[in-house]
UniProtKB/Swiss-Prot annotation:
Span list, region Disordered: 30-60
Regulation: induction: Strongly down-regulated in axillary buds within 6 hours after decapitation and then up-regulated.
Keywords, comma-separated and alphabetical: Developmental protein
Keyword Heme: no
Distribution of this protein across tissues and organs: Expressed in axilary buds and in non-growing stems and roots. Detected in sepals, stamens and carpels, but barely detected in petals or leaflets.
Biased composition (Low complexity): 41-59
Annotated source species: Pisum sativum (Garden pea)
Domain of life: Eukaryota
InterPro entries: DRM/ARP
Protein name: Dormancy-associated protein 1
Gene (UniProt): DRM1
Length: 111
C-alpha cells in the first residue's frame, strides 16, 4: 500500500526496502538455560530538542524603550553624542536638496 501512496515529487525517492529503512524494530529471545529473557533492540530516530538561548535576568539588564529611540533619535544613548556633530552640520559648500532640485541639469523639461 505504501508503494501506491508514495509520491516522488513530494516525498522524494522511495526507500530501498520498504518500511525497514524508515523504522527498525528487532526482537530477539535469548535462552540462558533455566530462564528466558527478552532482549529488544529499537532504533527509532529521536526528535531533536529546541536549543535554549541563555538569558540575563531582567533585573540585571537595562530595558531600552525602542519607540523612544525611533521617534526621538537624540535620546539613544549610543548615538547621542555623534548626532549633533555629524548629522546636523553639513560640510561647507555642500549642495542642499534645493540646489539639486532646481539646478539646470536636474530640472524638469516638461512645462
Amino acid at each position: 500500500m505504501l508503494d501506491k501512496l508514495w509520491d516522488d515529487i513530494v516525498a522524494g525517492p522511495q526507500p530501498e526496502r520498504g518500511l525497514e529503512k524508515l523504522r527498525k524494530l528487532t526482537t530477539t529471545l535469548k535462552d540462558d538455560g533455566a530462564s528466558n529473557q527478552l532482549m529488544r533492540s529499537t532504533s527509532i530516530p529521536t526528535t531533536p530538542t529546541t536549543p535554549v538561548t541563555p538569558t540575563t535576568p531582567s533585573s540585571a539588564r537595562k530595558v531600552d524603550n525602542v519607540w523612544r529611540s525611533v521617534f526621538n533619535p537624540g535620546s539613544n544613548s549610543a548615538t547621542k553624542s555623534i548626532g549633533a556633530h555629524v548629522f546636523d552640520k553639513p560640510l561647507p559648500n555642500t549642495p542642499t536638496v534645493y540646489d539639486w532640485m532646481y539646478s539646470g541639469d536636474t530640472r524638469s523639461k516638461h512645462r
